[in-house]
Amino acid sequence: MELVNICKEAGVPDGVVSLLSGDPAEISNELMESDIIKKVSVTGSTRVGKIILKKAADKVQRVTMELSGHSPFIVCEDVDMNKVADIAITGKFRNNGQVCISPNRFYIQENRKDEFVNAFMERAKKLKIGNGMDEGVDLGPLTTAKRLEEIEKLVDTTKKEGAKVLMGGQRPSGFNKGYYYEPTVFDDVKDNFTIMKEEPFGPLVPILTFKTFDEVIERANDNDLGLCSYLYTNSMDKAHIGSEKLESGCVAVNTGVVAIAEAPFGGIKQTGYGREGGSGAIKDYLNVKYTHMGLKI
């Protein structure tokens, strides 16, 4: 909403940028059924994206889809664990984990796992929960009551499947209102657990270990979603091989920054298709026309 206000203040003519707020299903139906709309870009869950894609098929409507992500966060043995923990904290708990590119599946090389977990939890325990508009607050609430309910359900499921809660796993004390949930770290997680298949979209951190680089790449790719991958290593060979073999639209190597305006951003698999950002993004909004013209006849 603020962005639309800025456009207006900057002198963008009325009608160039419009904002609709209301029932998402009703608004999307209206847009998809309109003959005026020539292109639709969707940011949302894979479930919702599939619904809109079916509607688009009736009109052969052009769409760009940036859907769910379930990003792996791979930490090799040759890195500074304190530096990686700093990146992990910022990336994981930005907007309390409610970001499509949030790292969700943490794979740590087994001989450095304890070091990473200790460094990560030391930082996570210092995060202040509260009103996001207040000074010094690091973690605000989840977006809705439904999101809080789904997080609690996933935590219960993860524990029942055999995971151990190292920290968190509950609503914070002293918060009688709002959809707050503590940063939660799990140990003893296996690849077939629900949390490794479904995007948590919240402050949940499952920790797993790996022995070899080839093994962890294969395990990281064992998912229907492919938005972003994070890889931390001081080996340029592993950095290049990992960036090529990881099945995602974006790869961040030794950094937590992956989405920038000048670069193409988007996913593969059931995360969708099309790109936002970069010079290539505008192509989805243009028609390609070929004309073959003789000089005279």
Label each region the model flagged:
Residues 39, 47-190, 253:
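ALDH superfamily catalytic-core signature
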Residues 25-27, 47-48, 58, 237-238, ...:
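Short alpha-helical
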Residues 20-23, 43, 91, 254, ...:
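Conserved residues at the C-terminal ends of beta-strands
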Residues 37, 74, 160, 173, ...:
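Conserved C-terminal structural/oligomerization subdomain of aldehyde/semialdehyde dehydrogenase
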